[in-house]
Structure formats: C-alpha cells, structure tokens
C-alpha cells in the first residue's frame, strides 16, 4: 500500500531530505503557490531527490525548476515499475510545468466489428466492450476510414447503424455499387454473412495467406458446381487481397504469423524533439503520426529522456503491441511495467535487419522531415504573430494566447456562444468551450455576448482570487461589429480587465479579405491587405470560432426540436420518447415508421402507435 509524505507548513528541505527513505517511490516538487512543478520516480527516493539539491550539473530545464521548489511530496511504492506507473498517472493528471508532456487529447480510434447478429463494421473510439471485436489502435481517424473502404470492397460488410439496418425495406446505394451484401433485406444468409465477417477478421489479424487459400478453395468449389458468378466474386476478392498484400510489412523474423508492431523513431534537432510512431497491425501498415513535446523550458533537450517519456505516456494504461522496434533503448523498469499490464512478454528491439531495418530507417527520415516542417510552420506562425503584435502595439513576446468569441442561433432559437483558443502557435481544441446562453432574450446578440464574457472572465477572476493558476489571454477577438465590441468594452470596465480587444467585422461587402478591424481602446477602424499575415491569423481563429459555435447550436437546436415534436404527443413521456428515438435512430426514423413498426416498440400500444403516427403525419 502506498504511503504518503506531505510537507509541514514551514517546509525545511534539508531536514526533509535527511529523513527520506532508501525506497522506491514517486516525488512531486511544488512552488510557493502550491502548483506542481515536476513529478519523478526513483528506485531510491533519498538518493534521487537529494541529488537535485546537491549537484550542479543539471540541464537548463531542471536547473530552472530546482530554483522554484518550495516543498516536496513523496509516495512510497513497492517497486520501481509500480513507481513508474504512478508517476505516469500523476503526470497525466497534473500536467506539471517541467515534465516532458506529449499532449494527445483523444483516445486512439479502432476498427470495430460489432457483436450484432449481422455485425456492423465501424469506426470506434472509446472503452472497448464485449462482444464486439476491435482492431487497432490506429494513429488517426483517416487510417480507420481508409481501412473500412478497403474492406468494403473485398468483404462487403454493412456499415449502417443498427437502427437503420433494422428498418430498411430495400437495399441502399452501397448494395448497388457492390460495397455491401444487403443483409438488411435478406440478400445474404446469416451463415454466409458471418463467413464474410470471419474472413475480414482473419485479414485484419494479418493471416492473409490463410484467407487466400480459403477463398481459392471456395472459388474452385463454386466453379466445379457451375456457380460461375459466385466463383467470379471469389476471384475478385483474391485479386484485391493480392494488391493489398503487396503493400504489407513482411516481418522477416516471423513472416507467416504477423505480429502487432510499433516502430518508434526519435529525432532531435535545434531544440526540437520528435517521436515518429508507425503502427503495423496484422502485417499492415495502418498509419503513422509524429509527436512533438513542449520543449520551450528546455533549450538543450536530452533525446533519451523524451523517448522514455513518450513510451510511458503512450503505452501505460493503453493498448500495446507485441513488438516495439525503436532507435533508442527502453529502460528495464519500463519494460517490466508494460509487460505487467500487457499480461504477456513483449519484444523490445533496437538492433534490426531486413524489412525491420528498412522500416525503422524510413521512420527516422519521417521524424527528421517532421522537425523540418515544424520549424517552417513555427516560422510562418511567428511571422503572423509578429505582424499582429505590431498592429496591437504589443511586444511579440507578450502575444501568445488569443481567445475568440462568437454567438450562433436560428432566429433566437438555441443560442450558443463559443470560445476558441489559439496558443503555442496553434489552435487548442481541448481548451475550447461552449456556453448555453440563459439570461439573454432570444435573438439579442449583444446580451448574449455580455453573458459569455462576464461568465468566462468573472469565473477566471474568482479562480485566481482563490489561488488557482489561470491562463489569461494576451488578446481577445470578438466576431462582430461595433455593437458587440462595445459590449466587450463595457464588460472589461465592469471587471477591471486590461486585455487588448479586437473586433473583426465582415464589412459592407461581407467578403473574405475585406474585413474591418476595430480596436476600441484606440478608436481605430481599418482594413488590412488581403495578403496580410496578421489578417490570416485573425481569419483562422475567427472562422474556427464560427464553426465551433454553429455546430454546437445545431446540435442543441435539433435536440430541442426532436424533444419538442415527440413531447407534444399525448401519452409519450421521456422513457417512451427515448425508446422511440433509440429504436428508429432519430426523429426522421420515427416519422418514416409505419403504425406496425411503432407498435413493436416496448411500451407503445396499438392505440398509442395510431396517435403517434397521426400526430407526425
């Protein structure tokens, strides 16, 4: 069981170090405000933590961190591998300023074959649940969708939602273009469809040769029985598999039983660090992705430290491959922790030959190219920020974080305000926020803007007053004209804020590139040239705010309309409404349903089905 050690009110670091145990565990460094600076793990807490205060050979990042340490907390663990897992959990939960962080806001997607009687092939992101089958993870959503398109051509599995599948009375377009066998209307037997599902799973598991032999046998049997159309279908499948197999990763170490393999290539150049991840599942290269940690607090990054941090954050508590091939060593404690979670032995390979060596070299080249591209991108983004800083009369070093607000509604219905964030030279989707407008009258954009600005920045003031760390924007962008920007100025006066404001209005022509910028504190209203880097930055953030607001508004509006349409029907309460929507996949499905279909829903009598049908028609 973990044992916590916490700091006294007046923390004495030398005394604390003297009493530390010679045991494995995790330590946390805090600054004077109580914010976590750094989380680390140790085989020997006393030796490791004392080293920070007794040595002078730290990297610039660690040296800067040590100067700010006010107090320390430790947690004793049973082993180094347990400490490593706990360290990773703390890092993910606390996001310490001086830890190496590979930010990835979403879980990785999978290709799913559902547990339905006629399984659906689908893109999936979330908790893995039985009896569904999952294949992956894939580096991004496009990799999953590309795989689905390929599998549709060969195995013709359905991709429609269960609610649609169960209420079709004729095949859809995918059947006509030979991408689905239309099990929804009985054009294929359950047994034959399940054969196709098994074949798809066999392919996804990398057993392409086995699948090809099975299909060849089926083709020969069909031809012998004079079923030439069916034989031709098997022939086409075999040919398609041959094309796909030519693009496969053939592992010279194990060519007949492909493993799940990840290749990791580390590259470090001029203060930038990149880890390039290549995902191979069942012998197929399903995608790759480059990861860049934040190195702004570390002018001389140590590549091995970053590589180890990536492996811990990328794999602990997540799906793992059978083999990790990398151009850097993985520490024994980390190997032990990964294998403990995986439940079986994993291979960690750094010396490669054959196809493995070729693929790892390609991954290294991709990592180096990604760094070059990142450097160009940073140069371009910095140029945009420099130009905007000049316009605002600011030092470009003081202009990093922008927040932009927009209001969206349909004639006053379902009003939503959006706040999007641009920081660290990129948009930050994980920091976006939507606000349901509750106090403003329908259609009153000015009151809606007042509400969202007051709520967001009033709450930030309260948090800061309570000692919490708050990220204030360096400038705030308002999507709107003089009316909206006037409201923002009023809120600023009420809250005592001194953050620069920029209004961006479409102008009389309402054309892109012809926007008017409003700087309320100087009274300036002007246009920038269409090729202005500063204008491009403002347009990017403004357009993202508009997109985020309108998608949120549409979801809220559509949900309200569905609820309203069914709630008006006598005898349909929340449970029956939900049962109808679940069964038919939404309001359109309910409207399209016959009286007989409605009767089949639990809780819907014949008389109520008649009432619902008449109300909707």
Curated annotation (Swiss-Prot):
Subcellular location: Cytoplasm
Residues covered by the GIY-YIG domain: 22-100
Major subcellular site: cytoplasm
GO terms under biological process: DNA damage response; nucleotide-excision repair; SOS response
Keyword DNA damage (UniProt): yes
Domain UVR: 209-244
SUPFAM superfamilies recorded: C-terminal UvrC-binding domain of UvrB (SSF46600), GIY-YIG endonuclease (SSF82771), RuvA domain 2-like (SSF47781)
GO cellular component, one term: excinuclease repair complex
UniProt xrefs under Pfam families: GIY-YIG, HHH_5, UVR, UvrC_RNaseH, UvrC_RNaseH_dom
GO molecular function: DNA binding; excinuclease ABC activity
Record-linked InterPro entries: GIY-YIG_endonuc, GIY-YIG_endonuc_sf, GIY-YIG_UvrC_Cho, Hlx-hairpin-Hlx_DNA-bd_motif, RuvA_2-like, UVR_dom, UVR_dom_sf, UvrABC_protein_C
Family classification: Belongs to the UvrC family.
Function: The UvrABC repair system catalyzes the recognition and processing of DNA lesions. UvrC both incises the 5' and 3' sides of the lesion. The N-terminal half is responsible for the 3' incision and the C-terminal half is responsible for the 5' incision.
Oligomeric and partner information: Interacts with UvrB in an incision complex.
Protein name in UniProt: UvrABC system protein C
Organism: Neisseria meningitidis serogroup B (strain ATCC BAA-335 / MC58)
């Amino acid at each position: 069981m973990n044992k916590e050690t916490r700091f006294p009110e007046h923390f004495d670091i030398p005394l604390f170090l003297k009493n530390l145990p010679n045991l494995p565990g995790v330590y946390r460094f805090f600054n004077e405000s109580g914010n976590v600076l750094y989380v680390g793990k140790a085989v020997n807490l006393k030796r490791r933590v004392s080293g920070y205060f007794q040595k002078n050979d730290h990297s610039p990042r660690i040296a800067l961190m040590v100067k700010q340490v006010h107090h320390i907390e430790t947690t004793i663990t049973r082993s180094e591998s347990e400490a490593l897992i706990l360290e990773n959990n703390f890092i993910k939960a606390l996001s310490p300023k001086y830890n190496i962080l590979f930010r990835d806001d979403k879980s990785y997607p999978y290709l799913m074959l559902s547990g339905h009687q006629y399984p659906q092939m689908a893109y999936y992101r979330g908790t893995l649940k039985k009896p569904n089958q999952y294949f992956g993870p894939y580096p991004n959503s496009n990799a999953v969708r590309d795989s689905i398109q390929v599998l549709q051509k060969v195995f013709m599995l359905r991709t429609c939602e269960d609610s649609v599948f169960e209420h079709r009375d004729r095949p859809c377009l995918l059947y006509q273009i030979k991408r689905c066998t239309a099990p929804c209307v009985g054009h294929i037997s359950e047994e034959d469809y399940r054969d196709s599902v098994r074949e798809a799973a066999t392919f996804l598991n990398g057993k392409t040769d086995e699948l090809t032999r099975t299909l060849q046998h089926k083709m020969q049997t069909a031809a012998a029985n004079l079923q030439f159309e069916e034989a031709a279908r098997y022939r086409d499948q075999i040919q398609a598999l041959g094309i796909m197999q030519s693009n496969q990763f053939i592992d010279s170490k194990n060519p007949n039983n492909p493993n799940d393999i990840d290749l990791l290539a580390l590259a470090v150049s001029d203060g930038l660090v990149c880890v390039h991840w290549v995902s191979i599942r069942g012998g197929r290269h399903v995608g790759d992705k480059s990861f860049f940690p934040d190195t702004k607090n570390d002018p001389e990054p140590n590549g091995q430290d970053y590589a180890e941090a990536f492996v811990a954050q990328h794999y602990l508590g997540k799906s793992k491959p059978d083999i990790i091939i990398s151009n850097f060593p993985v520490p024994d404690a980390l190997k032990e922790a990964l294998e403990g979670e995986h439940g079986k032995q994993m291979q960690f390979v750094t010396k490669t030959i054959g196809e493995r060596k070729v693929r790892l070299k390609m991954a290294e080249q991709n990592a180096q190219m990604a760094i070059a591209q990142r450097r160009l991108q940073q140069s371009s983004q910095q140029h945009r920020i420099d130009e905007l800083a000049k316009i605002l009369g600011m030092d470009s070093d003081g202009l990093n974080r922008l927040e932009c607000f927009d209001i969206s509604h349909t004639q006053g219905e379902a009003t939503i305000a959006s706040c999007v964030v641009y920081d660290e030279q990129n948009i930050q989707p994980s920091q976006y926020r939507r606000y349901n407008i509750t106090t403003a009258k329908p259609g009153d954009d000015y009151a809606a803007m007042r509400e969202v600005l007051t709520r967001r920045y009033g709450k930030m003031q309260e948090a800061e007053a309570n000692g919490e760390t708050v990220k204030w924007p360096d400038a705030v962008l308002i999507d709107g004209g003089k009316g909206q920007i006037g409201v923002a100025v009023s809120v600023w006066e009420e809250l005592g804020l001194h953050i620069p404001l920029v209004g961006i209005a479409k102008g009389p022509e309402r054309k892109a590139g012809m926007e008017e910028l409003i700087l309320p504190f100087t009274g300036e209203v002007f246009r920038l040239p269409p090729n202005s880097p500063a204008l491009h930055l403002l347009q990017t953030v403004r357009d993202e705010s508009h997109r985020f607001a309108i998608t949120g508004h549409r979801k809220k509006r559509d949900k309200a309309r569905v609820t309203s349409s069914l709630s008006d029907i006598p005898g349909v309460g929340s449970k029956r409404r939900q049962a109808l929507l679940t069964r038919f996949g939404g309001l359109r499905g309910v409207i399209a349903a016959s009286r007989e279909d409605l009767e089949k829903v639990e809780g819907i009598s014949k008389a109520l089905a008649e009432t619902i049908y008449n109300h909707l028609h």
